Regions:
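Periplasmic-side early beta-strands and strand-to-turn transitions of outer-membrane beta-barrels
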Residues: 56, 66, 72, 87-173
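Repeated loop/turn-to-beta-strand initiation elements of outer-membrane beta-barrel proteins
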Residues: 94-97, 137-140, 187-194, 204
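Short acidic/polar hinge/loop motifs at secondary-structure boundaries
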Residues: 4, 12-39
Length: 241
């Protein structure tokens, strides 16, 4: 059940308006270091939202070298689109940093039957991470990221039968986030770990649905919903040990 599966980024919840099943990820795969999955009884520690399990996305941090950079450029012939990414980071005298950015723009997908309408999309993102090890026991840092997309979808039946036309248009789906953390390790013989997290997050989405339904043998009635605009902003502070 996607409504009962909790999605986290670096242990912090992704907010989502319940206009569709589950929560949108809204993160570039290039920013992901690994993904942890928690199933079974342990997931109930995260609350009722996690009865189906927990997916925790761990983002990239700076490498162990003082400086490291990489980039990529890819061409997608099916959608005549480009995707570019760049990232850099490192560690120097207790300072750990990582920056990355990406941009994609793709047209409609080409299939043996022609171009599939409503499959074009655009996406841009950027993130920055910075932390400092004050000593072997205490670390503090921050992360800021933004993800902005423009996506569409349509049913193939539209190409075969105009009476079943359908599409969804999401010209704006954006997530902005700023997070702070402080963590202590091996503070004494009784307290091995203490962590504080605080973050501000905003999810902004515009969405429009269009469907044409046949009413009788010859009549087709189009139904176009107005643009639904929703904003969800939250501030969370949490202390764990």
């Amino acid at each position: 059940d996607t409504f009962r599966t909790l999605t986290l980024i670096d242990g912090q919840k992704i907010s989502e308006q319940k206009s569709m099943s589950g929560a949108s990820i809204l993160i570039d795969p290039n920013s992901i270091e690994r993904i942890e999955v928690i199933k079974g009884p342990a997931s109930v520690l995260y609350g009722s939202d996690a009865l189906g399990g927990v997916v925790n996305i761990i983002t990239k941090k700076g490498s162990k070298k003082p400086f490291e950079a990489e980039g990529s450029v890819a061409w997608n012939g099916a959608g005549h689109g480009w995707a570019e990414t760049i990232s850099l980071g490192g560690t120097y005298k207790g300072l750990n940093y990582h920056l990355d950015a990406g941009y994609q723009s793709h047209g409609n997908i080409k299939t043996p039957l022609g171009y599939q309408k409503g499959t074009d999309f655009r996406q841009k993102n950027a993130s920055a991470f910075l932390s400092y090890d004050f000593n072997e026991h205490f670390t503090a840092g921050l992360r800021a990221d933004t993800f902005d997309s423009d996506i569409n979808s349509s049913s193939w039946e539209y190409e075969q039968d105009p009476n079943s036309e359908f599409f969804v248009r999401i010209p704006k789906w954006k997530r902005d986030k700023v997070a702070l953390f402080a963590e202590g390790k091996n503070l004494n013989e009784y307290l091995t770990r203490l962590r504080w997290d605080g973050y501000w997050q905003k999810n902004h989405k515009n969405m429009r649905n269009y469907v044409s339904q046949p009413q009788g043998p010859m009549k087709v009635v189009p139904i176009l919903t107005p643009i639904t605009e929703s904003n969800l902003t939250e501030q969370v502070f949490r202390l764990t040990g």
